[in-house]
Amino acid sequence: MDKTTHFGYKTVAESEKAGKVAEVFHSVASKYDVMNDLMSGGLHRVWKHFTLTTSGVRAGDKVLDIAGGTGDLSRGWAKRVGKTGEVWLTDINSSMLTVGRDRLLDEGVILPVSLADAEKLPFPDNYFDAVSVAFGLRNMTHKDAALKEMCRVLKPGGKLFVLEFSKVWKPLSPFYDFYSFKALPIMGKLVANDADSYQYLAESIRMHPDQETLKQMMLDAGFGKVDYHNLTGGVVALHKGVKF
C-alpha cells in the first residue's frame, strides 16, 4: 500500500504529491513574481536580500539554488560570486524554470540551468560552497531525503540556507490566518485566475515544520551546526546549516 503524505490539508498518496505540486506551479508560473510582490507587499525581496547579505558567499564560490523558480536568489548569487564563481539555477518544475531562465537571460545573467529533483540531485559529493532553497522545501514530499542530498553536495564547511514560511509570532496569528485563508485565495483568483493554488499555499505553510523542528531535521540530515533567524515576526525564518 502506498504511503501517504499531506498536500496542504489533504492526505494523498506519496506518489501523487509531486504531480499535484507540479500542477500548482505550472498554473502560477507566469504570474509568480507579480503575486509574490502583491502577497508580501514586496517583503520577499527584503527576506531574500537578508539571505544574500548574511551568507558569507564570496567571489569564486560555487552555489546551488534549489527550487530556484524565477531566479531571484540565483541572480543575487551570481553577482556575489562573480565571473570566477559558479551558480546553478535548478527547479523540478519546467514552467518555473523556463520563466526563470528567460528572465535571467533578459537581464544579461548567463548561468547553467537544470531541471532537477532535490531528493535526487545530479551533482557530485562535496562540490558546492553554498546551497539555497527559498520557499521550496515545504513542497517537497520527502524533506528529510532532500536535506540529506543538500548536505551531500556541500563541501565540508559549506552552508545551506533554507528561507521558508514558518510559525508566526502568536499575537499575529489571528490577522495572519485571516489574511492567509481569506485574502490570498481572492488575490489568486483576481490576479492569476487560480484561487485553489493560493489556498494550497496557505495550507502548505501551516503544515510545514516549525522553526525548532526544521532545525532538528537539518541536524539529523548531517549538518553539524544549525541556527535560524525569524523575519517579520516569524512569518518567515532563515535557517543556516553548516556541514562539518
Curated annotation (Swiss-Prot):
- The gene name on file is ubiE
Q: Which Gene3D superfamilies match?
A: Vaccinia Virus protein VP39 (3.40.50.150)
Record-annotated residues binding S-adenosyl-L-methionine? 70, 91, 117-118
Q: Has UniProt tagged this entry with the keyword Transferase?
A: yes
Q: Which HAMAP family match?
A: MenG_UbiE_methyltr (MF_01813)
Q: State the EC number(s).
A: 2.1.1.163, 2.1.1.201
What top-level branch of life does the organism fall under? Answer: Bacteria
- Give the function comment from the record: Methyltransferase required for the conversion of demethylmenaquinol (DMKH2) to menaquinol (MKH2) and the conversion of 2-polyprenyl-6-methoxy-1,4-benzoquinol (DDMQH2) to 2-polyprenyl-3-methyl-6-methoxy-1,4-benzoquinol (DMQH2).
Q: Which reaction does it catalyse?
A: a 2-demethylmenaquinol + S-adenosyl-L-methionine = a menaquinol + S-adenosyl-L-homocysteine + H(+); a 2-methoxy-6-(all-trans-polyprenyl)benzene-1,4-diol + S-adenosyl-L-methionine = a 5-methoxy-2-methyl-3-(all-trans-polyprenyl)benzene-1,4-diol + S-adenosyl-L-homocysteine + H(+)
Pathway, per Swiss-Prot/TrEMBL?
A: Quinol/quinone metabolism; menaquinone biosynthesis; menaquinol from 1,4-dihydroxy-2-naphthoate: step 2/2; Cofactor biosynthesis; ubiquinone biosynthesis
Query: Which InterPro entries does the protein's record reference?
Result: SAM-dependent_MTases_sf, UbiE/COQ5_MeTrFase, UbiE/COQ5_MeTrFase_CS
Keywords recorded for this protein, A-Z: Menaquinone biosynthesis, Methyltransferase, S-adenosyl-L-methionine, Transferase, Ubiquinone biosynthesis
Q: Which GO terms describe its molecular function?
A: 2-methoxy-6-polyprenyl-1,4-benzoquinol methyltransferase activity; demethylmenaquinone methyltransferase activity
Read off the CDD domains from this record: AdoMet_MTases
Methyltransferase in keyword set = yes
Any one Gene Ontology BP term: menaquinone biosynthetic process
Annotated protein name in UniProt: Ubiquinone/menaquinone biosynthesis C-methyltransferase UbiE
| Family indicated by similarity | Belongs to the class I-like SAM-binding methyltransferase superfamily. MenG/UbiE family.
Enzyme class per UniProt? transferase
Could you tell me which PROSITE patterns the record lists for this protein? SAM_MT_UBIE, UBIE_1, UBIE_2
Q: Which Pfam families does the protein's record reference? A: Ubie_methyltran
PANTHER family per record: 2-METHOXY-6-POLYPRENYL-1,4-BENZOQUINOL METHYLASE, MITOCHONDRIAL, METHYLTRANSFERASE
